[in-house]
């Protein structure tokens, strides 16, 4: 049976810069894009320190937020001095893609076939897919392989989450939600759920069968790589998880 490993590098644009310029790890770093009207919007970011204990939980920075809003959040969490120290760099999608392709070639140590994911819904690639069919045995099993991938990249200074499943799509979903996806074998002990960096979806477990839910049923619908409008539409009709989508019939979907 084919098996695929997805390695997700969250906030890849800023991770690439931190890898090339380690000195940036000491200061808040923003990668921004200039829009048509001259507004700077955040593409990726990194904070080297946790918020101050006295600070209330700050608003979450999301891609597309204006730089001014992001700096306001930074000031709330770390004080105004952090804004003065912040490093602001311009978006460079071509360099980001080249860096990810170079990392994909490095990932061929796990299996000969490895490549960068295709961009979907206007989002730049942040994942590497590796065809690990028949190669996991050389690493002591799939749980050991997926763990080795995350740890080896961490040793290089990269934060990565990895998952193995029957298809690239299922592995992508599990890698983006390792806190919700199956952890693998019982012996594969990790940190608490919110800290998990890898997951293994057992062969065939992603399929919905009579009397048994699919292993990824509890993941949010965003794990299907749908555009934001479709995700919002599904939530409006009460469908928040992949399991909710799988259990829908064509007739009930039309009525909703």
Locations of regions flagged by a protein language model:
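Flexible loop/turn segments at secondary-structure boundaries
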Residues: 38, 169-172, 252-254
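Charge-rich, low-complexity amphipathic helices
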Residues: 100, 175-176, 256
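Short helix/loop capping segments that flank catalytic or ligand/cofactor-binding pockets
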Residues: 15-17, 139-140, 173, 234, ...
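Residues that scaffold, gate, or flank divalent-cation-dependent active/transport sites
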Residues: 1-129, 134-136, 143-151, 155, ...
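Structured, non-catalytic alpha/beta "coupling" segments that mediate domain-domain communication
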Residues: 144-200
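Compact, charge-rich alpha-helical regulatory domains located at protein termini
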Residues: 75-76, 180-256
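Hydrophobic alpha-helical segments
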Residues: 22-24, 140, 145, 179-180, ...
């Amino acid at each position: 049976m084919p098996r695929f490993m997805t390695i997700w590098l969250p906030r890849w644009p800023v991770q690439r810069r931190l890898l090339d310029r380690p000195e940036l790890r000491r200061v808040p770093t923003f990668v921004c894009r200039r829009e048509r009207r001259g507004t700077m919007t955040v593409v990726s970011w990194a904070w080297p320190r946790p918020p101050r204990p006295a600070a209330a939980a700050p608003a979450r920075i999301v891609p597309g937020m204006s730089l001014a809003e992001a700096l306001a959040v930074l000031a709330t969490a770390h004080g105004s001095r952090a804004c003065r120290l912040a490093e602001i760099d311009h978006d460079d999608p071509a360099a980001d893609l080249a860096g990810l392709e170079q990392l994909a070639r490095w990932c061929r140590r796990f299996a000969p076939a490895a490549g960068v994911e295709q961009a979907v819904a206007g989002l730049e690639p942040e994942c590497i897919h590796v065809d690990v069919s028949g190669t996991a045995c050389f690493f002591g099993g799939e749980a050991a392989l997926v763990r080795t991938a995350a740890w080896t990249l961490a040793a290089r200074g990269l934060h990565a989450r990895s998952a193995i499943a029957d298809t690239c799509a299922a592995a992508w979903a599990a890698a983006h939600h390792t806190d919700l996806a199956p952890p693998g074998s019982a012996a594969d002990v990790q940190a608490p759920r919110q800290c998990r960096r890898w997951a293994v979806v057992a062969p065939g477990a992603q399929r919905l069968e009579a009397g048994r839910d699919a292993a990824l049923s509890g993941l949010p619908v965003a794990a299907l790589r749908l555009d934001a409008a479709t995700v919002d539409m599904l939530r409006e009709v009460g469908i928040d998880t992949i399991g909710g989508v799988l259990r829908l019939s064509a007739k009930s979907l039309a009525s909703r």
